[in-house]
Curated annotation (Swiss-Prot):
Keyword Translocase: no
Sample GO molecular function, one term: mRNA 5'-UTR binding
Gene it is expressed from: csrA
GO CC annotation, single: cytosol
Entry protein name: Translational regulator CsrA
Pfam families to which the protein is assigned, alphabetical: CsrA (PF02599)
Matching InterPro entries: CsrA (IPR003751), CsrA_sf (IPR036107)
UniProt organism field: Exiguobacterium sp. (strain ATCC BAA-1283 / AT1b)
Keywords: Bacterial flagellum biogenesis, Cytoplasm, Repressor, RNA-binding, Translation regulation
GO biological process, alphabetically ordered: bacterial-type flagellum organization; mRNA catabolic process; negative regulation of translational initiation; regulation of bacterial-type flagellum assembly; regulation of carbohydrate metabolic process
Function: A translational regulator that binds mRNA to regulate translation initiation and/or mRNA stability. Usually binds in the 5'-UTR at or near the Shine-Dalgarno sequence preventing ribosome-binding, thus repressing translation. Its main target seems to be the major flagellin gene, while its function is anatagonized by FliW.
Family affiliation: Belongs to the CsrA/RsmA family.
Length: 75
């Protein structure tokens, strides 16, 4: 993991298309501004994890449904 220090108003570039700017530091929170093309998905970590869990649950449900249909057609 690359670790960088930035002050308020300073930025980091990721590749050619993404700029991450420290907009404000308020107590124990840092406000970030992200400038990226619209095709790049950006999510808070906890939201991303929740999305992954929901996608896995949906895949499991779809697989279970598929198995149930196969069993019915075999009977």
């Amino acid at each position: 993991m690359l670790v960088l220090k930035r002050k308020q108003g300073e930025a980091i570039h990721i590749g050619d298309d993404v700029t991450l700017t420290v907009l404000a530091i308020e107590g124990d929170q840092v406000k970030l501004g992200i400038d990226a093309p619209r095709h790049i998905d950006i999510h808070r970590h906890e939201v991303y994890i929740q999305m992954q869990e929901e996608n896995e649950s949906a895949r499991n449900s779809a697989n279970l449904m598929k198995q149930m249909i196969q069993k019915q057609s075999e009977a």
